[in-house]
UniProtKB/Swiss-Prot annotation:
NCBIfam families: PRK01318.1-3 (NF002352), PRK01318.1-4 (NF002353), yidC_nterm (TIGR03593), yidC_oxa1_cterm (TIGR03592)
GO molecular function, one term: membrane insertase activity
InterPro entries: Membr_insert_YidC, Membr_insert_YidC_N, YidC/ALB3/OXA1/COX18, YidC/Oxa/ALB_C, YidC_ALB_C, YidC_periplasmic_sf
Name used for this protein in its record: Membrane protein insertase YidC
Biased composition (Low complexity): 40-54, 64-81
Amino acid sequence: MDIKRTILWVIFSMSLVLLYDNWQRANGHASMFFPSANTQQAAPAGAGGATPQADVPKANATNAAPGTVPAAPQAAAQPVGEKVTVTTDEVRAEIDTAGGILSRLELLNEHEKDGAPVVLLERDVNRTYLARSGLIGGDLPNHTTVFTVAPGARTLAPGQDKLDVVLTAEKNGVKFVKTYTFHKGSYVVDTRFDVTNTGTAAVSPTLYLELARDGSKVEKSQFYSTFTGPAIYTNADKYHKLTFEDIAKGKATVPAATDNGWVAMVQHYFASAWIPQTGKQHSFYAEQIDPNLYRVGIQQPLGQLAPGATVSTDARLFAGPQEERMLEQITPGLELVKDYGWLTILAKPLFWLLEKLHGFLGNWGWSIIGLTVLIKLVFFPLSAASYKSMGKMKDLQPRMTAIRERHKGDPQKMNQEMMALYRTEKVNPLGGCLPIVIQIPVFIALYWVLLSSVEMRGAPWLGWIHDLSVPDPFYILPIVMAVSMFVQTRLNPTPPDPVQAKVMMIMPLVFSFMFFFFPAGLVLYWVVNNILSIAQQWQINRMLGKGKTAAVAKS
């Protein structure tokens, strides 16, 4: 029984590692064990990138008007514009009139380790992440055209609920007006696009909305990773992730044209998304612009405009943290950027329960502890059944050893007598394994809840833990975890095989080393889980001991 239990825990541990590695590869990251031989070291995406006209998207075949030929790429100097800074209670945004693009966005209530606001959108020599829009279908105003900004307030004043920034450009007989509306207490920027034909011939413009980003990850860890890259959602195809690697190789597929959905750029804890007006037909695209610069976008045909005619359409731009409840209120499916993968069906209820505990306890650290206790209580009957089954197997160990010795030269006869013994004593040799296997998906789902939740970012617990999303600065929790794992191994009978005994002694050290680099919230969960497991094992052994004493007394 001890050998089987040791093997079970080794299999359980390796299953966790392999499942995690599979998750990594499914999210476009290199395997921990089989790194890709052709991994490219992409050059940084600078502020310049492609030539202005070359990086304007071409009209999709389904959007192009009859006889419309996309403008050929032309070498041109980078346009020079003015930077307009807009400040609300949630964001500080920078709009570049060269293209009318959102070129920088700081999240004022989300902070880095040094206390500076998180910068989500940005353009400099090392990083490119932009929200762009424009017109195609001829040489029309686009994100390389210099716009004129209308005068007006740039800071949301006390008592003010919204603030408008209006930009205008005219080119080749088409006037294009963008209006950005920033709201108090919101990460959503409403955008309005007014297109007027000021020329003498009909035009058929197509509006594009895109997010352009370099392929570099914002944060890197050798022991855990989350998805970074574009995503597309439609009511028909649901949530669809695109890896930068697939886009570069031309393997990325996008949903068919529709009148709903959105496009997004996703990274750990944060995301941005263009959400077009519902009910308006549009198509999707995902492309590589430069060796380390990609874009995902939407193209919406605006129809044929006669001279003097105007057409208007709306869209929304979200750029902020992946707060699940907030995302649910913005548009259908946007909460899926907080990616739990194939364990969503378990992870979402766990996060819901964690939120409820936080509403009661007011601290995410104590909420993690509370959730761990509740999970242990739910699985207590299964754990008791597991220990009971293993206890019976332990009692049968002398008889099983005798059978092995008696029939060591006849495996078939040995197995027959073993099965007869199991039937007589009503023991299932796998009875100790199944309860543990059932719990594995829940443990993994909770792991991803804690790793993915931006609510843990900057959330303190007590004393030295000021941020549950970063490693313990003094490594106290990993050390406590190592001690708790060591105690667990000592509570179990020593395996008869010396090699297995050494493995069981080394495992706490190996796991503890890994957890030195894990977020404190995750380590807190494992520490509490281990301590509860020790208490649970002691209680179950006590219950089994009382049962045996009572049985002996009756006999």
